């Protein structure tokens, strides 16, 4: 994968870099003026760009494309800015399906806070130890807040058990499509992601946790994107470690 920044893009932003991430979370960052290509194994790749204008204290992160990389292919991403309309455009080589992507990079859009998550009923850095077959006493939920409005909520799952149930490794909870039935069947519940999405939504893992067996970890990672294309600064990760239910008999 190669990245190209036009002069208009370079003049509009004081600092910038592109990031290509694999579905496993490995990342390669293309810093300013980097012209070398990076090599990736075939599979899903996620392209993001980090930008900051002069005078801004924080950078903005945009998810620009998710695509399937094939063996022996070279992919070129070109970043440009139409200064008159304050629009950032990202175009792709013919190997990547889809038209160019456009983002509002006006001061109002750049100053809008990125989406963020709040955990309820669990601590992100601590594995959640559930009892196999029992619903947690407290609700285990994740709240997403996007001031500009929610565009998508991406759930990445690492669980051999759920994979065997045809549960998707990656799914947009705002548009689950064919996976909606299995998500519901296994107990995952959402509010605020259906139909006309607003600023807040909830992902409820409580009933899903009841159905998870012992024998390892089940990892769920959430990432949100707002209507401007900004992504949450930090993904929210829930790690569930079910324990067996043992009874002592006198």
What residue spans do the PLM features occupy?
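Extracytoplasmic cysteine-anchoring/structural motifs
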Residues: 1-249
